[in-house]
Amino acid sequence: MTCRQGLLILFLGVLAFSMGCAPLTERSKGPALSGDVSFCYAIFPVERWESVHKIEAAIQGKAIFTLLGVTRGDPKEDGLHSLLLTPEGFILLEAEMRDGKTRTLKAIAPFDSPAFTSGLMEDVRLLFLSPKGKPASGGKREDGTCTCLWARPDGSSTQIKGSMDLGWRIVRRDEQGDVTREVLLNGPFVNGLAAHMELRAFKPASYKLRLTLVQAGP
């Protein structure tokens, strides 16, 4: 293992164990619109795909490290297979998710923690697969922006808002209405994959992932 790989693993170890950071509080009011919600699915792939992303990871605004992410997805089966690698191709984590269940295929410490793998795959799912079920409400506003809201019985929710011209924003809130994840998507879109994505996590760990699409295919 090179010195660079060692530093990268140390940095990501902080990400794996960082806990208890303050969440961003923002109450969900929900869209007061109803109608066609098909536009909310246009920002996600509808067929099987494989993609490669350059990932810039930062914790609490500090040092940024570059990683590579390889993801294979099957929207119809709600399935994901992901690899997290160093720029040199050293595999840090390989995992899959199907029907909400996560399985670790390969991991080096400290990434062999089930909690870390589960959290990472939930982030991957938020980025690449549409929320489960049907939106509770949705519609299109006068300014052309579209909004959809998925609400769960426990009070948590996922909201998608935006347009192809202005970009999209995905917000996930917990049972208390605190924002735990925010995703920004900007085109162009290639088979439902945004060229530029940014995930901001606020709770329980604070970090940011900026993804740039390098390659996409079936």
What are these regions (language model features)?
Residues 30-54, 148:
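Post-signal peptide N-terminal segment of mature Sec-exported envelope proteins
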Residues 145-218:
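Gly/Pro-enriched, hydrophobic low-complexity segments
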Residues 45-105:
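N-terminal mature ectodomain segment of secretory-pathway/periplasmic proteins
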Residues 84-88, 97-101, 106-110, 164, ...:
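A mature extracytoplasmic/lumenal domain signature
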Residues 1-21:
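Sec-dependent bacterial lipoprotein signal peptides
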Residues 103-132, 136:
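Acidic/charged, solvent-exposed loop-and-adjacent secondary-structure segments enriched in E/D, K/R, S/T
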